[in-house]
Amino acid sequence: EMTSSLVGSEMCIRDRSWLLYNFLSGAMIQLDEENKSIYEQILQDDAYASEKALLTENGFLVDYDELAFIRVANKRACADKKTLSLLIAPTMGCNFSCPYCFEYHRAGVMSKEVQDQIIQFISDSVKKNHHEHIFVYWFGGEPLLAADIIESMADRIMTIANSNGIQHTSAVVTNGYLLSEKILRMLEKHCVERIQVTLDGVGQINDASRMLHNGEGTFETIMENLSRRTTINIVVRSNISKRNMEHYGELYSYLVDFNKKYGTNLTLYPARMEVYHNSKTGKDEKLSQEEFFKYLGERGFLSTQKINDAKFVSCTAERFHSYAFDEKGNVYRCWNDVGNELMSFSTVDQLLRDNGKVKTRNIVPYLDNGYQFDDECLRCKLLPVCMGGCIMKRNFMKERTCTPIKFHTDDFVLRKFFKESDTSKGGEIHDADC
């Protein structure tokens, strides 16, 4: 028996014109007043065969359990072997003292022994699972404090990829302070396609929360480093809190002018400042989801973000072939856990022994995501593009993290409609996709 899709959205886009959007199939259908009337009658009427066929083809009418389909798709996506996804922290040390930082900083860098074990693990996994792609996220701490280790390990990973005829790409999360000309060119040569640098505002606004250990500011040095042209896509993340939210527009304008002046192509990404149990920042500075997305939406800062296709995974943490390594060789699922040895589920040495001991309590919550959706998620039309949000926050912090589309659904759907109708144009600086 045919029923209406649980993940379809209906909205009026102009006088006597309606738009249907399906978050599972990604299909859009525009209806005039006559067809809207047919659409409302179609389930009760055996006529309209061609109209029913169109709606069925695009997912607006279904004869199967969509939630069961999403769960099955989630399991298949999590087990997919195409990409071996790795986060590697060559050091957990850092040269900054950011009060909101969630990371577990400590001195020291990755030993040669641990480096060798990780490289051996990558080589073994490629041979065993026939991966088509190795993706590495260089993380920390501040990873560029160990740039020599990145260079050495990246050389060896490139050799593995080349000898097996597969693709290798990587990205770096850095505070940008050490992103010198020499290091930037080294990263270009080692398959780095994306660098994320955080700025919390312009000048002193940034320096109030992102400073060196001696309290000195960092903004000028970071911007000097970002002025260099590069083939790497550089994303500027801005952690927005009650303290700096009114200065986000200033940063946006500053980067537009900066791109024009230096011929760069910096991309801006607004992020809600998070407060973790090991953060020094008080919860009173944190914006709620509603406050955060309302602020961005009312000021047009979501205008270049777009709707994701159905992805069936919330993040790489729930993929079977995804691993995060700290400098000691501890292995984690979530990069927010890296350095917190209590959340490690194994060590690289144990993984190499194949049947090594695994701490089940630290891995099951990430690998069983599809069966942990609560009633609100199960009722939400956005489930296919959100998949329940951050697993770590939901399971360990009992906090919901929703997509911004939830708070501005009509705006997102309309932008997609007008873009695909070739009636909208991009701006000079773009926000990252949600």
Language-model segments: residues:
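Single conserved hydrophobic/aromatic residue that forms the stacking wall/gate
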Residues: 1-8, 13
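N-terminal [4Fe-4S]-dependent radical SAM core
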Residues: 14-30, 49-87, 129
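N-terminal pre-triad scaffold of radical SAM enzymes
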Residues: 75-104, 119, 123, 128-137, ...
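Iron-sulfur (Fe-S) cluster-binding segments and ferredoxin-like electron-carrier domains
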Residues: 101-113, 338-341, 383-414
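Radical SAM/AdoMet-radical enzyme domain recognition
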Residues: 119, 123-137, 146-273
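Short Fe-S-cluster ligation motifs
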Residues: 121-140, 402-434
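Flexible glycine/acidic-rich beta-alpha junction loops that bind and position SAM and/or redox cofactors
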Residues: 204-209, 265-286, 308-315, 338-348
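C-terminal accessory region of radical SAM enzymes
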Residues: 284-310, 336-387
